[in-house]
Amino acid sequence: MDVKMHSSWKPILNEEFQKPYFSELISFVKSEYTTKVCYPKGNQIFSAFDHCHFDEVKVVIIGQDPYHGPNQANGLCFSVNDGIPFPPSLHNIFKEIETDLGKPMPSTGNLERWADQGVFLLNATLTVRQSEAGSHQGKGWEKFTDAVIKQISAEKENVVFLLWGGFAQKKAALIDSSKHHILKSGHPSPLSANRGFWFGNKHFSQTNDFLKSKGLKQIEW
């Protein structure tokens, strides 16, 4: 498995890489990718880390699990590969951006353009078996990604954390709110959004307002 991760993360996460659970996790993932169809592609598992260098993290969005349909997942939470129809949650994210910032729907759901600006798009579990949602949960990924969130919180300041839905909101316990900005809302999935828990949260303009107040470059959402 080709693990691709930008070098800026390696000193930050080296301690985790040495832990027994991480070795067991990587062995499990290698076995799964050898014997099953899994997503994202092996060389995209750590795409969030590769596109968004540690020194440049300004915003963190936390997802739960990669998409488990063919050609959807590309290693960035909520994002899909170019040419793939928008899944419902992603469509609702773009609808909120349209309302909040007046930006038209984009032509692609590939969020690499966000990641390259310092938006760290982290799924709690980084891999999944085809058509089996949650199939790689409880194997060590959550322990690893919790450690990533803690390290961002400890080593950086003035990061905006966007916590959408109950699962992501629990991660607030890992974040030092005295030096970071946490925004919470319902999940953008139709189940939540259509009940009034997503639309109108204005997280995208609020994020940019905060970044501007700290003298940081705003995100082109």
Curated annotation (Swiss-Prot):
Catalytic residue list: 65 (proton acceptor)
Similarity remark: Belongs to the uracil-DNA glycosylase (UDG) superfamily. UNG family.
InterPro entries: UDG_fam1 (IPR002043), Ura-DNA_Glyclase_AS (IPR018085), Uracil-DNA_glycosylase-like (IPR005122), Uracil-DNA_glycosylase-like_sf (IPR036895)
Major site of localization recorded for this protein: cytoplasm
UniProt entry keywords in alphabetical sequence: Cytoplasm, DNA damage, DNA repair, Hydrolase
PANTHER family: URACIL-DNA GLYCOSYLASE
Annotated protein name in UniProt: Uracil-DNA glycosylase
GO biological process: base-excision repair, AP site formation via deaminated base removal
EC number, as in UniProt: 3.2.2.27
Catalyzed reactions per annotation: Hydrolyzes single-stranded DNA or mismatched double-stranded DNA and polynucleotides, releasing free uracil
HAMAP family in alphabetical order: UDG
Keyword check for Cell division: no
Gene: ung
Domain of life: Bacteria
NCBIfam families according to UniProt: PRK05254.1-1 (NF003588), PRK05254.1-2 (NF003589), PRK05254.1-4 (NF003591), PRK05254.1-5 (NF003592), ung (TIGR00628)
GO molecular function annotations of the record: uracil DNA N-glycosylase activity
Cellular location(s): Cytoplasm
UniProt lineage: Bacteria, Pseudomonadati, Bacteroidota, Flavobacteriia, Flavobacteriales
Cellular component, GO annotation: cytoplasm
Function: Excises uracil residues from the DNA which can arise as a result of misincorporation of dUMP residues by DNA polymerase or due to deamination of cytosine.
